[in-house]
Amino acid sequence: MRSTPLHPVARLPEEWSASLAARGERSFTAKQVFQWIHRRGVLDPAAMTNLPARLREHLAAEGLGEVLTPERVHRSEDGTRKLLLRLRDGATIETVLLPSVSGPGSQAQLDADAAAALDDDEDDDAAAEAGAAPRVRVTQCISTQVGCAMGCGFCASGVAGLKRHLGAEEIAGQVLLGRAMLEEGEELRNVVYMGMGEPLHNYEATARSLRLLTHPEGINLSTRRVTVSTSGLVPEIARLGADFGGQIALAISLHAADDETRSALMPINRKHPLDELLAALRAYPLPRRRRITIEYTLVAGQNDDPAEARRLAKLLRGLPVKINLIPMNPIEASSLGPPAQERVAAFQEVLTQAGYSCFVRRRRGDDVSAACGQLVLLGAKPKVRRALG
């Protein structure tokens, strides 16, 4: 049971209907309030001009207002923007906007192979044929916790451990704010739960935020364009599949093909070893023609040997997957580092020859520490991780 009432930004239309009906408001006002917040991105009750004054006063009294405040925006040379956001209790998180131009002669690069199915770009092709300017599609990477409890050896987010979970209003609020900060010609196309924190460790808030972001009366993101990445919390993977019918795109932070290596890199593997994780993936109710994304961070001298690639190919045999190779991005809190390019290419070649769709993720925003594994709790004191034995 919840110990505190739902924040207004976290309420779904049916919850607004119940609370406003109890106040004697007309039935249609619930839809209006939800649309003001989640379709228009307006959080100031005074600006909700089609609502009665008494209702605007009530919303203000309930605490409707900004849930996070942008403190700094770091812009990378490649156009990536990392936003440092201040929460109401003073804690900070980070979210990242990754623009990608699509059109003739350009590379549609969506970080993290963003939303599983990118086969519906006929509108872009038609615009190009008509002579329209290429659109700038944006993927937003959002956080679900202040810090992280998973302790992965190649990731900066957990260097100071978990401080607290984010509320659904703070998770969805990142997208509301990110959408408001889009630049001319940009459109938000994909949201990836790959920022600070383990989304499924904060399951209730993550699931509620998914419902908010995909609700037809709000932003109305297609579930195909929303990806949840997990380090492998097996019961919650099953729960996500059951609650959303497998419609939410799933990404698995795997990073090793044997339990010994994976447990050294990712402590969660000691609780949910590979056989449990693979069983959960086989049971995930994946729609036809959809695949699970396997994220594999290549760490020099740890998991980047071609023999490891062959083990990975064998491990994943029979699963509907695509593989995203991520050369480790340097972080201050770790002595681990990325492999040489030749090593990455050799690893990819093994997987490609084994019949897998395998891509190497292009670095985005690493010059402003916005790349994969670099989002970090502000003020965290690093505990240096040594190379694994």
From Swiss-Prot:
It is an enzyme of class 2 (transferase). Disulfide bonds join C141-C372. Specifically methylates position 2 of adenine 2503 in 23S rRNA and position 2 of adenine 37 in tRNAs. m2A2503 modification seems to play a crucial role in the proofreading step occurring at the peptidyl transferase center and thus would serve to optimize ribosomal fidelity. [4Fe-4S] cluster binds at C148, C152, C155. SUPFAM superfamilies: Radical SAM enzymes. It is found in: Cytoplasm. Belongs to the radical SAM superfamily. RlmN family. This is Dual-specificity RNA methyltransferase RlmN. It holds the Pfam family RlmN_N. The keyword tRNA processing applies. Its cofactor is [4Fe-4S] cluster. The active site is at E94, C372. S-adenosyl-L-methionine binds at G197, E198, S229, S253, L254, H255, N329.
